[in-house]
């Protein structure tokens, strides 16, 4: 399942001290970060993930970003999406 996460960043210093590639690769089995798009003003970021469920991703990511951001999750409609990476589109 493809999931987009919107991060409302409360603590930019803490949030951006984390390595996005490490966070993306450090989840439980079946959870993989694919893309990371931070805003230039560091107030928000959007990420694309692959995971078995929103709950599995939420359990991991809310813990990792605790105190740094508030996260909103939604499943991507892959049939209508544009530009999904090949691995995410499969």
Predicted region positions:
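Short S/T/G/P-rich N-terminal loop/turn motif that feeds into the first structured element of a domain
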Residues: 1-69, 73-90
